[in-house]
Amino acid sequence: MIETDRIISANTVQTKDENSIDRAIRPKTLAEYEGQPAVREQMEIFIQAAKSRKDALDHTLIFGPPGLGKTTLSNIIANEMEVELKQTSGPVLEKAGDLAALLTNLEENDVLFIDEIHRLSPVIEEILYPAMEDYQLDIMIGEGPAARSIKIDLPPFTLVGATTRAGLLTSPLRDRFGIIQRLEFYSVDDLAKIVYRSAKLLDLDITDDGANEIAKRSRGTPRIANRLLRRVRDYAQVKASGVISYDIADKALTMLKVDPVGFDHMDHKYLLTLMEKFGGGPVGLDTMAAALSEEKGTIEDVIEPYLIQQGYLMRTARGRIATLLAYNHFKLKIPDSLSSDQQQNLSL
C-alpha cells in the first residue's frame, strides 16, 4: 500500500495521537455502526445465530477501499461475540512460528484479525488451510530425514481477513471464508451522522450544516471525515468561538485546499495538466508521470482511483481521458480539436 501525506487520502500516515483518537471514537457495536446497511443486517443475523449455537462465527473476509472501516468491523465482531480479538497483518507473519504462536494462544471462539491478508506468503497460507477447515495446526518438526509432521488441535476460532485488494487473494484461501463482505463508499448522509457522532464524543459543538459540509468533502470515507473534523476543530478554536458551523467548515476546508467535491491540490494539478497541457487526452501513464513529476505507482494507486470512481477521468487502452464532468468542474471549454469519438466518450 502506498502511503501519502494528503489530508484527503485514506492511506495518510497518522500520528500516535491521531490513532488513539480514532480508536476512542470507533463504534463498538453494530447498533453504533453507521452506514453499510446490508453488511450490518447480515452480520447481525450471522452473529446472533452463532451465539445461539455457541459456535465460532464463520471465517469472514472484509474487503473494500482503505478507510471504510474494515478494522472497526472486525473489532465489532469480537465485541458482539463477546470474545477476545488478536490482531496482526499479512506482512508481519513471515515465519510459520509467527502464525503458530498466534493460533495456539487463541481461546475458544476468539477472533484472529489479519489485515492486508492478500500479502500472506504461500508458506503461511498452507498452515492456515487446515487451521481454518479442521481447527488443526500441522507443522514440521526437525529437518532432513529426521523431520516429522505433528498435528496440534486448536479451539474453534474465527479468522477475519481484511484487504483492499481482494483480487490478489488466492482461490484456495478465498474459498475458505464462509462470510464475504464488501464495504462500499458511504453516502453524504451516513458520513454526516459519523461526523456528528465523532464530534459529540470529542466534546465539540457542531451544527448539522457543519457536519454535512465536512461529509460532502470526505470522499465517501469515514477515516477522511474524522481527519477533516479534527482540522476543522483546530480552525474553529483559533478563528472562531469553537462552534463548527457551515461557514467555519467551509472556510477551514477551503484553507486546507479541499474543494466542495473533495478534490485537493493533487487532483486539481492532475486534471488541469491533462486538460490544459494535453487537450483532455488520451495521454499515457509515462507522459502524465513526467508532466506531474510523480511516480507512476502514486498516480495509479493514489490519485486516479477517486477521479475514475466519480466519473472525472477515464482510463482507456489509448490512455487517460478527462470527462465532461472534469471540464464542467473547472469551467473549461471542451477543445474543438477533439475527435468525434473522444467527444462521445466525454459525454458518457
Curated annotation (Swiss-Prot):
ATP binds at residues 25-26, 67, 70-72, 133-135, 176, 186, 223. DNA binds at residues 315, 320. GO terms for molecular function: ATP binding; ATP hydrolysis activity; four-way junction DNA binding; four-way junction helicase activity. Mg(2+) binds at residue 71. Transmembrane segments: none annotated. Residues 260-348 are annotated as: Head domain (RuvB-H). It catalyses: ATP + H2O = ADP + phosphate + H(+). Residues 4-186 are annotated as: Large ATPase domain (RuvB-L). It is an enzyme of class 3 (hydrolase). GO terms for biological process: DNA recombination; DNA repair. GO terms for cellular component: cytoplasm; Holliday junction resolvase complex. It holds the Pfam family RuvB_N. Residues 187-257 are annotated as: Small ATPAse domain (RuvB-S). Keywords: ATP-binding, Cytoplasm, DNA damage, DNA recombination, DNA repair, DNA-binding, Hydrolase, Nucleotide-binding. It is found in: Cytoplasm. Its EC number is 3.6.4.-. The RuvA-RuvB-RuvC complex processes Holliday junction (HJ) DNA during genetic recombination and DNA repair, while the RuvA-RuvB complex plays an important role in the rescue of blocked DNA replication forks via replication fork reversal (RFR). RuvA specifically binds to HJ cruciform DNA, conferring on it an open structure. The RuvB hexamer acts as an ATP-dependent pump, pulling dsDNA into and through the RuvAB complex. RuvB forms 2 homohexamers on either side of HJ DNA bound by 1 or 2 RuvA tetramers; 4 subunits per hexamer contact DNA at a time. Homohexamer. Forms an RuvA(8)-RuvB(12)-Holliday junction (HJ) complex. HJ DNA is sandwiched between 2 RuvA tetramers; dsDNA enters through RuvA and exits via RuvB. An RuvB hexamer assembles on each DNA strand where it exits the tetramer. Each RuvB hexamer is contacted by two RuvA subunits (via domain III) on 2 adjacent RuvB subunits; this complex drives branch migration. In the full resolvosome a probable DNA-RuvA(4)-RuvB(12)-RuvC(2) complex forms which resolves the HJ. Belongs to the RuvB family. Has 3 domains, the large (RuvB-L) and small ATPase (RuvB-S) domains and the C-terminal head (RuvB-H) domain. The head domain binds DNA, while the ATPase domains jointly bind ATP, ADP or are empty depending on the state of the subunit in the translocation cycle. During a single DNA translocation step the structure of each domain remains the same, but their relative positions change. NCBIfam families: PRK00080.1 (NF000868), ruvB (TIGR00635). This is Holliday junction branch migration complex subunit RuvB.
